């Protein structure tokens, strides 16, 4: 390109010199007319380059203006919005040669919140005025969109006995409340963000008021909670009244070893078989009841306040019930999704230790890899893989204050359908104070604004 341009300019210079020496007839006039297109082309290149620089500066100012307007757009009138847009833009756009600057901003909430800022200006020319173009018009547009993707976030929170040490439960409560505030602030309208909370230990609590529900299997509970009297032919047992149940359920599947059953690894609704139903258990370390998807932020905070550390660790049941809270079933109802929006379904699983007991394995004190296998196996089976394959993204957090080995189980569980193993979604902290930082980091990644174009 440079060689061609030099060839043209050299050729033009030689011919121009010849024209200047030639005094015959109208050669001088012809020369002047002939040079006009050349001057115009050179002038256009210079002026166009200058205008492009102004346009780039204008676009950068529009992008920043759109982002800054997004913070308060929902509370401003259209007049105030445009006044604020002009103030932001003028503070950012430092090109005094630009004239007739015009800025227009609009805010809409259909299918999510969106700010659109359009701008234009004229740039005086240096050379093109010779051929009648005294200025060039430049323009741009920037869109900041948020809320076009709605969030549904399930929090599976470890409420086991070990959370009582090192200030972990206190830190978890504080971090969870801060995360709830982040998520609340990300919602411009009700329904933009739903959150569920699943406190877990060995069991989860689905609410004792559901004792008449047809999705509960009472077989083991009736056997374990009965009053027996007499002897011989006169020996008889009477099951306790089910209204004395404390609300806890354990892993789905057969009473004995699960074998090939995978009911504990899916969110499929129960059928009429006992193995598919959720088995009641009078667990003496029953955690606070789960809270299904809601944007009742006060109710969610009340659940957090009620959490107490007690019991053994069964991460698989916390994880599968977090999933259940996103799809519904049992005591949980899920609001319909609006086709005008995209949705991101998220699970955040936080635990401070390794698995110690489920319905079939472990004693609550020692680590049980048999419990781990219900959640993840190297062959790709287990609850983690099932959840990610369904389109739900999993974040996992290991609060390791006891110097345990890093939880490869939680590390392998983190990910999404697009990236089944994603270490960027696994976090490990070695002190209770680290919980807040991780929750904040995850909350920020879920709620950040984006410039759409």
Where are these predicted regions, by residue range?
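DG-centered beta-turn motif at the end of beta-strands
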Residues: 156-160, 172, 200, 322, ...
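MIDAS-like acidic motif and immediate structural context at the N-terminus
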Residues: 40-47, 147-172, 176, 349-357
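VWA/integrin I-like adhesion module and closely mimicked acidic/polar interface patches used
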Residues: 337-344, 353-416
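…and closely analogous acidic/polar surface helices at protein-protein or active-site interfaces
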Residues: 54, 162-194, 201-203, 217-220, ...
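Short, charged loop segments at secondary-structure junctions
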Residues: 72-75, 207-320, 416, 420-423, ...
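Short amphipathic secondary-structure patches
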Residues: 2, 7, 45, 49-52, ...
């Amino acid at each position: 390109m440079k060689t061609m341009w030099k060839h043209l300019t050299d050729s033009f210079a030689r011919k121009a010199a010849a024209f200047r020496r030639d005094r015959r007839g109208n050669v001088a006039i012809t020369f002047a007319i002939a040079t006009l297109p050349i001057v115009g082309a050179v002038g256009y290149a210079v002026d166009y380059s200058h205008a492009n620089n102004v346009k780039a500066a204008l676009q950068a100012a529009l992008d920043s203006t759109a982002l800054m307007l997004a913070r308060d757009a929902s509370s401003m009138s259209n007049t105030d919005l445009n006044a604020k847009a002009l103030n932001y833009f003028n503070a950012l756009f430092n090109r005094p040669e630009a004239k007739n600057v015009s800025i227009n901003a609009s805010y809409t909430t259909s299918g999510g919140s969106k700010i659109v800022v359009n701008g234009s200006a004229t740039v005086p020319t240096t050379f093109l005025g010779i051929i009648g173009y005294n200025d060039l018009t430049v323009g741009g547009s920037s869109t900041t969109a948020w809320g076009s993707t709605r969030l549904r976030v399930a929090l599976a929170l470890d409420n086991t006995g070990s959370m009582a040490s090192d200030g972990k439960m206190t830190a978890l409560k504080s971090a969870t409340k801060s995360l709830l505030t982040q998520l609340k602030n990300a919602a411009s309208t009700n329904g933009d963000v739903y959150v569920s909370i699943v406190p877990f230990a060995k069991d989860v609590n689905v609410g004792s008021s559901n004792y008449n529900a047809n999705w509960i299997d009472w077989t083991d509970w009736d056997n374990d909670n009965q009053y027996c009297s007499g002897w011989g032919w006169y020996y008889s047992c009477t099951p306790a009244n089910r209204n004395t149940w404390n609300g806890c359920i354990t892993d789905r599947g057969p009473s004995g070893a699960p074998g090939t059953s995978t009911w504990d690894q899916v969110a499929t609704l129960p059928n009429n078989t006992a193995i598919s139903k959720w088995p009641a258990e009078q667990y003496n370390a029953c955690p606070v009841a789960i809270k299904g998807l809601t944007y009742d932020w006060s109710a969610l905070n009340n659940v957090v306040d009620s959490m107490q550390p007690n019991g053994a660790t069964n991460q698989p049941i916390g994880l599968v019930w977090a999933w259940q809270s996103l799809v519904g079933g049992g005591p949980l109802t899920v609001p319909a999704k609006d086709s005008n929006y995209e949705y991101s379904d998220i699970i955040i699983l936080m635990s401070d230790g390794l698995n110690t007991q489920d319905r079939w394995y472990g004693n609550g004190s020692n680590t049980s890899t048999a419990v781990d296998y219900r959640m993840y196996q190297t062959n790709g089976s287990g609850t983690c893989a099932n959840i990610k394959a369904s389109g739900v993204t999993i974040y996992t957090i290991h609060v390791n204050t006891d110097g345990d080995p890093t939880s490869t189980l939680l590390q392998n569980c983190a990910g999404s359908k697009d990236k089944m193993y994603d270490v960027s979604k696994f976090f490990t902290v070695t002190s209770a104070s680290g919980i807040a930082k991780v929750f904040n980091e995850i909350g920020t990644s879920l709620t950040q604004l984006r410039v759409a174009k």
